Amino acid sequence: MRKVIIMNSYLRVKTPYFLALYTLTFWTFNSFMGAKEQHHFLKKVTTTEQKFNSSAPLSYQSEEVRNSTSSRTVISNKELKKTGNLNIENALQNVPGIQIRDATGTGVLPKISVRGFGGGGNGHSNTGMILVNGIPVYGAPYSNIELAIFPVTFQSVDRIDVIKGGTSVQYGPNTFGGVVNVITKEIPKEWENQAAERITFWGRSSNGNFVDPKEKGKPLAQTLGNQMLFNTYGRTAGMLGKYIGISAQGNWINGQGFRQNSPTKVQNYLLDAIYKINATNTFKAYYQYYQYNSYHPGTLSAQDYAYNRFINERPDNQDGGRAKRFGIVYQNYFGDPDRKVGGDFKFTYFTHDMSRDFGFSNQYQSVYMSSQNKILPFKGKGEISATNPNCGLYSYSDTNSPCWQFFDNIRRFVVNAFEPKLNLVVNTGKVKQTFNMGMRFLTEDLYRRSTTRKNPSVPNNGSGFDAGTSLNNFNNYTAVYASDEINFNNGMLTITPGLRYTFLNYEKKDAPPFKEGQVPKTIKDRYNQYNPAVNVGYKPIKDWLFYFNYQRSYIPPQFSNIGNFVGTSTDYFQIFNVMEGGSRYYFNNQVSFNANYFVIFANNYFTGRYGDNKEPVNARSQGVELELYYTPIRGLNFHAAYTFIDANITSHTMVTNPANPKGPKKDIFGKKLPFVSPHQFILDASYTYAKTTIGLSSFFYSRTYTDVLNTVPFTQYAPTIKNGAITTKTAGMTPWYWVWNLQISSTLWERKKQSVNASLQVNNIFNMKYWFSGIGTSPNGKEAAPPRSITAYVSYHF
């Protein structure tokens, strides 16, 4: 144990020197070994580099997708940018099995669930490994799995690759829902520049249009000025000769979300570089600075929602954050995998320093009063503290309430990691084996600070400020993994067994300021986990693949409390066993069809916001996913998908009945997991003629439950006021909705390397009115979804 701590400290200080020494040694060794046959070797290595290209596939037509032994969807650049997507959340709506609850329209903090899991917790996406260019972007990829900050902006993205089965060996924990890899724009061969502007107009007036009747007679600029979102983008990139390439991107987002008084500001700067030493050795590096601030109006009571679903009754709901990310990758290619032996070696080092601050009042969980200062009709008995009997008579943000409190929850995540990885191909002709082996060592430093402000006029509240408590975590993880892809008869049969084994070391320390009489404590925990997986593929003919995969995945113990509320903190492992079987068929490059069945068995799954229960449950989610691509003629493309999900609780877990908190608890065995739409339809199409593209996209979600008791009618329960926190629970099924988007894109002018491109898109064409149940912004009440919006875009390439 003591040796691990010394090693951990050494790595944090000496990693850059270790990286340079390791890379130089490996490069020198390979250069020496290959020097005698350099004139033959370089030609072979070029082929090897192509076969081990680490870039994600470009579209569903790519060989990586055709031969994938799991369900896989690629959102190509054309689908991403020309079918009416407003942000990355919109784009992910095009993937079967992924469900999005977009409550802001800005794309700042996506709410993602996959195959029935992820709607709980504190609302921030905590299901599925989220990567940017293959690097994890969770603040703490092991002990704080949530997108508390999402350092990605829409205009910087090139495409998105989604794999939903058999990935635990390569990617580690939290892969039971799949892996989402966001690919940013790559460095082009020739130098290019781009300047672009994107403006979104929200139709958020009381009648859903762009000009509110109540503001009739006012100048148009005044009525529209407070409901616009500006998205400015600039980029310069290219190769400086044969060996060195650089890319610099900047993205600035400023304006309003679709709710009233919801200012949003984002800055995103990206620097990428590549150094091609020779045909066998390459360095890549990146640096990113990302910062955001936003307000989240959260939920409304049913009465306020009916009055005006766009009002903001929670001005205290706000968050902000900053991310600094850096990484460097060295890659070496050797041999010829088509003949005997070949492959590539990759060494990756990455680090990030992320911080975020969530601020909200203790009315975070309440919908106890309407904006018209009327007490709401409640069901049930509720529970009122004798010391504060009238707290429920105050509005959401009234600081005069004797119960009013405001919480600041500051977190900082510092991660350092390195990973050597080897792909080795041994080809004997009839049998081809690809050995994939590697090791990842990762450290997490977490710094937590929570403060509270109270009403100073209330006795015993003192000055009204409580410094709270601080807690630091210093964790490290070592994972080793290996897999062997055995390929028979030129790909007719492929079997890939694999195993990943991880050592997890946790250390928690109390940090100042200490409360009177507090004795600082240090707690250390040591765990280990294994992830077996197997993928099988069979091709009766060249373009028809049958596949099956199994994986064991897990979520480690989590540290993610939010103030005094239920976060996602756990002291146990959540275990998932995932099986998937399906088939993928291609016909003449015109048709691609994938059908698969999946089942996920969850043990000790943390339900979080599903109720006041902190106890985990067992659950089973199973379903069918169908996906079709069809290109009948040149320029015309169709994409359709359907997902059925049946997610049930399989343990006898007792939960509190919100209608009678002190009464007997209820068994939720057999109940459906909340926030899961059993039926999901996807339909999008595009047609390109000359220099103009017309794109259409749509998504349908069936109704969902919002509580583990599966309440059908919308119900507002009597408030519970305890220890200064006010809770008014609600329950009831959300409505179904089918949203349609339309975009027209065209090249307006073109001359040599210069061009002007523009587009006009309408999202939620029919102004579908629907709501969610406050996932991540306030867990009770109705949270409005984005209304109709119009987005204008213009870009100059030169």
Indicate residue ranges for each PLM-predicted region:
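Extracytoplasmic beta-strand/coil segments of soluble accessory domains associated
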Residues: 57, 72, 89-136
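Conserved C-terminal beta-signal and adjacent last beta-strands/turns
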Residues: 20, 237-239, 276, 323, ...
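Face-selective signature of the C-terminal outer-membrane beta-barrel domain
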Residues: 276, 280-282, 319-511, 594, ...
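Structural signature of Gram-negative outer-membrane beta-barrels, strongest in the C-terminal barrel
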Residues: 278, 413, 428, 432-436, ...
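Gram-negative outer-membrane beta-barrel transporters
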Residues: 423, 488-495, 504, 598-601, ...
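Membrane-embedded beta-barrel scaffold of Gram-negative outer-membrane proteins
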Residues: 331, 342-363, 539, 545-555, ...
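Short acidic/polar hinge/loop motifs at secondary-structure boundaries
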Residues: 135-164
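Transmembrane beta-barrel wall of Gram-negative outer-membrane proteins
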Residues: 221-297, 318-333
